[in-house]
Design a protein with these regions (language model features):
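Charged interaction segments
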Residues: 28, 39-145
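A contiguous, surface-oriented mixed alpha/beta subdomain in the mid-to-C-terminal portion of proteins
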Residues: 2, 32-37
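Short, extreme N-terminal segment that most often corresponds to the first beta-strand
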Residues: 1-28, 144-145
């Protein structure tokens, strides 16, 4: 049996409160160590990015007093809290690419703004585009096998 292996990385983005964001990201976990980067853009604003050689699983409670037994927050909750940190006029694009040997090869993008969360899958996008190029709206294919 093969293991799923992936890498995850974001674009550069701005947040409302850099210190609060750093604190939140210190509680985010995945299959390996999450790296968080920051740099200043041309206007001097702090931009962040993050990534890891695995997927993001969720985040840990802020303190033991606020946690139930075995309490941690999953990926959906991670996205909801991330959404609260993003600057109003910016977006986080979380890119993940992975594989399980050659059986599954996946690539996705999750776009998170302060108001919306949308998920894109490269197989779906490619199949839709192929149908357009073939001028056959009902064309479909199997990408995972």
């Amino acid at each position: 049996m093969a293991n799923y292996e992936c890498a995850t990385r974001t674009n550069c983005f701005r947040v409302k409160d850099p210190e609060a964001f750093r604190k939140f990201m210190s509680r985010v976990y995945g299959g390996c160590k999450l790296e968080v980067w920051e740099e200043k853009d041309a206007a001097g604003n702090i931009q962040f990015g993050f990534g890891c050689y695995d997927g993001i699983s969720g985040y840990e409670p802020e303190s033991p007093e606020t946690a139930d037994d075995d309490c941690d927050y999953g990926y959906d909750e991670f996205l909801e809290v991330l959404q609260q940190h993003i600057a109003e006029d910016d977006a986080v694009i979380i890119l993940e690419c992975g594989h399980e040997k050659l059986r599954y090869i996946t690539a996705s993008a999750i776009i998170v703004t302060s108001k919306d969360i949308e998920s894109l899958d490269v197989c779906d996008i490619a199949a839709s585009r192929a149908a357009v190029l073939l001028n056959n709206p009902s064309w479909c294919t199997k990408c995972d096998y």
